Amino acid sequence: MGVEALGRYSTNYRMNRVFRPDRAALVVPIDHGLVWGRVKQLEAPVTVMKRFLKEDVTGFMVSTGIVKASEVELAASPQMARILAIDAFWPTSAPDTGTGTLVASVEDAVRMGVDCVKLLLPWNVNDVEKVQYCKRIGTVVSEASKWHMPVMAEPVFLAAPRSPEIIEAELEVARVAYD
């Protein structure tokens, strides 16, 4: 099956599933197992998802395993968008460093029928890693355009307290993610 058969939905169609007509979205993140390991409140992600199906949310941020595990529930709630986390990040013991990798591809996302792919953009890492993350995002954006798949960059400061300095720095990384 070629790109045309699998990529039958346009980017605008997918974006309109994620965002309401007023361009607002409320997405429930339940993809943190890839980065944070076991999170007590998220140990049963499909159960968490079920709690929100009748609420005023537009969709869920999920991992590949959650996409597969929630197919029945989301088939019964087709209005819910799915944003697939296609990368993961693990902090290392060295200050200002970590390691990240892709764990799924844009083609995987298309085959799973999700509406958007999401990558992390850790900003409290060294400059070399920032460049690597931006390069990875650029590569994914290029691949996603072939499949008409929207891409979300999630700017994050990992393991950083919510100080005024971090909040100010988040404005910078949010602008980088937007651009």
How should these model regions be labeled?
Residues 20, 25-29, 33-77, 81-91, ...:
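Alpha/beta enzyme core
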Residues 2-21:
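N-terminal basic/disordered segments at the start of proteins
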